């Protein structure tokens, strides 16, 4: 239940600050920056300017934070009905819808100008494009209409890879495109296991995530397909000359363990295992570890060639 503006004004200042920070979803942004900074090392083939790294990270944080705030503004009706999102600032009344909207728009404008004036305008437009894609295409159009929402909506989360490259080179190349595709094929098998866990929440609010409209067997099969394509694409960097033995070894080992987990989930789904024994969150947690390991290898590889 939303509180009145007068009661919001009585909230401690520190709690209000924490609420606005929560609107940006810092933990998700950490994952986005994990993919941005290593690509800067790859583009530089060494250590990029510390100033450039800091400005790119700040711009990326503000842009993604603005997108997340606008997402919460649009989804405030269903967030109030889902257990997983019931403590978000708009639901608890710590922040009003008007404040959230103004905050999100402000971050979008500031991040675009920061990128354009201190990094380059290619990065600025990519950043703005990611924000608009997430807010308009995913949140407003796809999320409540199709079970493929996270597949195409996930494009927004892939663009930080391109931004990392463009911030250093002010251009594009095949290397960031390949890593963009890695993230594109990573997103569904990353998010679907979580959706399997909380599918009742999504069903309650009418969001047709794939696990809501399809059986666990179907979802697990899709996870395996996307996983194989993701691992295969991740290995394209080396034959094209962008990475060497270290990245290749890490990609093979990390990818192999991912496939082991994905097939394990599929086998449990085929056996019609349900509840905690399905262990779908094992793959979700590993997916975060996988992308962290893979992109650390992207950053380290130039120093070992």
UniProtKB/Swiss-Prot annotation:
Record EC number: 2.5.1.141
Enzyme class: transferase
Principal localisation: membrane
GO MF annotation, one: protoheme IX farnesyltransferase activity
Entry protein name: Protoheme IX farnesyltransferase
Gene designation per UniProt: ctaB
Domain of life: Bacteria
Note in the entry: Carbon 2 of the heme B porphyrin ring is defined according to the Fischer nomenclature.
